[in-house]
Swiss-Prot record:
Induction: Up-regulated by heat shock. Component of the TFIID complex. TFIID is composed of TATA binding protein (TBP) and a number of TBP-associated factors (TAFs) whose MWs range from 14-217 kDa. Interacts with TAF1. CDD domains: TAF7. This is Transcription initiation factor TFIID subunit 7. Keywords: Activator, Nucleus, Transcription, Transcription regulation. Its main location: nucleus. The lineage of its organism: Eukaryota, Viridiplantae, Streptophyta, Embryophyta, Tracheophyta. TAFs are components of the transcription factor IID (TFIID) complex that is essential for mediating regulation of RNA polymerase transcription. The keyword Nucleus applies. The keyword Transcription applies. Expressed in roots, leaves and inflorescences. One of its GO terms (cellular component) is transcription factor TFIID complex. It is found in: Nucleus. InterPro entries: TAF7, TAFII55_prot_cons_reg.
Length: 239
C-alpha cells in the first residue's frame, strides 16, 4: 500500500500544473514544484516556480480509495486516502479546524453535519455519578442517593418507548415478504416481551407500596429502604 493524499489547488495554479504535465520532461524539470511543512505538520507552503502559496493539511470526513490500472481493464487498489492538502491564494484565510467539512463529491457536501451522528449532550456530573455507582456495584456495594420516585418515573418512560418500538417493529416486519414461520416467531417473541414488561410494571407498583409500608416503620431509615428495594429489583432482573 502507498501513502497518498488529495492535492487541491486554485484554478490559476491548476492551469500551470496542467501545462507542466503536458510539456516535455526537460522543460518541466526547469520549473521547481515542491511542498514544505512547518513543525506542526498542518501548515506549509506550496511552491511552483518562484511563486509560493500557503497550504494546509486537512482531514477528510470519509476515506477515499485510490486505484490504478495498466491495461484500462483491471484495477488495483493502491491506497486509502483520508487527508487533503488545500493550497489557497496568499490573501485567502486559513481554515479554522483540521477537520474538513465537505467531501470530494457533491453528495458529500457538509458531510460532517448532515451525515454524522451528533455527540450526545451529557451532564458531566451525571456521568461521574454513574461511573461511581457502577464501580460500587462491581465492588459489591450498593447505589447511593437513589430516589425511588425518580427511578419509577424513568422506568415508566422506558416502557412507553419500548411499547412504541414494538409497534414499529411489528409494522416493519409483518409484511408480505416475510414467511409464515418468521411471522410466528416474531409474534411469540413480542408476546414474551410484552408479558415480561407487564410483569415488571406490576412489580414496580408493588415495590412502591412496599416502600411506603417500610417507611412507616421507625427501625428502618430511608437509605436502608432504598437498598432493600434495589436488591429486590436486581434479583427480579437476574431471574
Amino acid at each position: 500500500m502507498e501513502e497518498q493524499f488529495i492535492l487541491r489547488v486554485p484554478p490559476s495554479v491548476s492551469e500551470r500544473i496542467d501545462r507542466l504535465l503536458s510539456e516535455d520532461a526537460s522543460t518541466s524539470d526547469e520549473i521547481p514544484l515542491d511542498l514544505f511543512f512547518s513543525e506542526d505538520g498542518r501548515n506549509g507552503t506550496f511552491m511552483i516556480g518562484n511563486d509560493e502559496f500557503p497550504a494546509s493539511l486537512l482531514d477528510l470526513p470519509a476515506v477515499v480509495e485510490s486505484f490504478k490500472t495498466y491495461d484500462d481493464c483491471a484495477l488495483v487498489k493502491t491506497a486509502d486516502i483520508g487527508q487533503m492538502i488545500m493550497v489557497r491564494e496568499p490573501g485567502d484565510p486559513a481554515p479554522n479546524t483540521v477537520e474538513y467539512r465537505h467531501g470530494l463529491t457533491p453528495p458529500m457536501k457538509d458531510a460532517r453535519k448532515r451525515r454524522f451522528r451528533r455527540e450526545p449532550d451529557l451532564n458531566p456530573e451525571l456521568v461521574q455519578r454513574v461511573e461511581r455507582d457502577l464501580l460500587n456495584i462491581l465492588s459489591g456495594g450498593t447505589v447511593e442517593n437513589v430516589s425511588f420516585s425518580f427511578y419509577f418515573r424513568h422506568m415508566m418512560c422506558l416502557y412507553l418507548l419500548l411499547g412504541f418500538s414494538n409497534f414499529i417493529y411489528l409494522n416493519f416486519f409483518w409484511c408480505r415478504y416475510m414467511s409464515k414461520r418468521n411471522q410466528l416467531r416474531t409474534r411469540m417473541l413480542v408476546m414474551q416481551v410484552r408479558k415480561y414488561l407487564l410483569l415488571h410494571l406490576h412489580l414496580l407498583k408493588s415495590l412502591k407500596l412496599l416502600r411506603q409500608a417500610l417507611v412507616i416503620q421507625q427501625e428502618l431509615n430511608r437509605r436502608e429502604v432504598n437498598q432493600k428495594i434495589l436488591m429486590i429489583q436486581c434479583e427480579f432482573i437476574i431471574i
